[in-house]
Amino acid sequence: MYDLGPDFDDATLAPGTNVLVSGPPLSGKRRLALELLAHGSAQGEGAIVVTTRDSASRVLADYEHLVTDPESVDIGIVDCVTKHQGRSVRDTDVVKYAASPEDMTRMGIKFSEFVEEFRRQRGLENIRVMVDSLSTLLMYSDVQTVFRFMHVFTSRIENADALGLHVIESTAHDDETMNTLKQLFDGVIDVSDDGFSATLPSVDPAD
């Protein structure tokens, strides 16, 4: 089970759950998703961030502010930004690179590599995954292409018994696009300047 912490009244989500974190620009949705990852790190869980808008160094810097012992955190970042900016980089234990936010095939491969490493080499049972952001994917590809990719990606999260947190800018897309993508997720966290509301799947106590 995945504990969401006191901000969510200590609600828990079943392994394999995918949640859409939706809100307008500057509403704090990215930070909320990072905080949910950090809450898992505090309990010894793994964290994987697929970033299509910020470099891995920025993600790491922001994440380190949210955890008490950054050196002990098991985190992996799939960076789809740095190579796209023309910089020459190689994969490390912490960061793997895709060519651009359009390179969804490589994005999926690198993500799967991290899941395999976390499970087999580090012995991590629980993994929280953050994708930031679906809106960037939609800047480079049409909604049908993104839907197909995310259908596969969310299935991988489900098969890995991980928890998926997928960030999107709600005001950047029309209702049809939002409704199409929402079909892929088990729950939604709507973030606004005033806070957030969550529609999450209930968990059977027998689980």
Which residue ranges define each predicted feature?
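P-loop NTPase catalytic phosphate-binding loop
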Residues: 56-99
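Phosphate-binding/switch region of NTP-binding enzymes
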Residues: 166-207
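Phosphate-binding/switch loop-helix module in NTP-utilizing enzymes
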Residues: 84-152
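Loop/turn-to-beta-strand initiation segments
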Residues: 46, 74, 125-128, 159-167
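Conserved nucleotide-binding/hydrolysis micro-motifs of P-loop NTPases
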Residues: 53-57, 82-85, 135-136, 170-174, ...
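Short, well-ordered beta-strand core segments
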Residues: 19, 47, 164, 188-190
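Substrate-engagement module of ASCE P-loop NTPases
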Residues: 136, 148-172
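Glycine-rich P-loop/Walker A and Walker A-like loops and their local beta1-loop-alpha1 context
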Residues: 2-64
